[in-house]
Structure formats: C-alpha cells, structure tokens
Regions:
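Conserved catalytic SET/PR domain of SAM-dependent protein methyltransferases, capturing the structural core
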Residues: 1-107
Length: 107
C-alpha cells in the first residue's frame, strides 16, 4: 500500500468525514472541533464550458435541515469563475453533522 502523499487528491479535508446520517443517507461530519465562520472548503464551482456547476464531495453530501449549522458564501476564483464555500454558523463539535438550509431566501 502506498504511503500518503500530501499532494494526492483528497476529496474531503482531514477535519471532515462521511458517515451515516440520521437526516438522510450519508452526511458530512466534523472530526475535530471547528470554530464559527470556519471555511470548510469548496462545495460547487461554475464551469462555463459545461454551462453549469460541478459539485465537490463536500457539496454532494451536506444534508438539509431548517436548523442548519453552516452557510454558503459565493466567491470568485483566480479566473473569475463563481465558486461556493461552506462556512460554519457556530462552533461545531467533533462528531457533529454539518448541515445547510437548502431553501433560498425570498426577496
């Protein structure tokens, strides 16, 4: 078995893992204590050639709840492509599932 190389692709950061969710199927869980407004990573990126978005593993497994503990922030990357990052709304305990409210706020 090859040893881990920090330059290998890692679908989730070391402070996150996938696990069975009590909300729905598989969810994303913290493997460490996380502070408020902590950037958990990219969930989606706009790919103009595809005329749509690519979802990362982080974006694919965060479950919905009305009492979410995370939120999304839209940013522009180095090529001015739209990317979305997941941030914590409050301190997250080790073992806690990370959640989003999928409903868009109505203007």
């Amino acid at each position: 078995m090859p040893t881990y190389n920090k330059f290998y692709y890692r679908p989730l950061p070391e402070y996150l893992m996938l696990g069975a969710s009590s909300i729905e199927g598989t969810g994303v869980f913290a493997t460490a204590e996380l502070k408020t407004d902590f950037d958990l990573g990219m969930t989606h990126l706009k790919v103009p050639i595809l005329n749509g978005y690519v979802r990362t593993p982080l974006g694919g497994f965060v479950n919905h709840t009305d009492e979410a503990n995370c939120y999304l922030v839209e940013k522009l990357d180095w090529d001015d492509y739209r990317v979305f990052h997941l941030y914590t709304l409050r301190p997250i305990k080790k073992g806690e599932e990370l959640t989003l409210n999928y409903h868009l706020d109505e203007a």
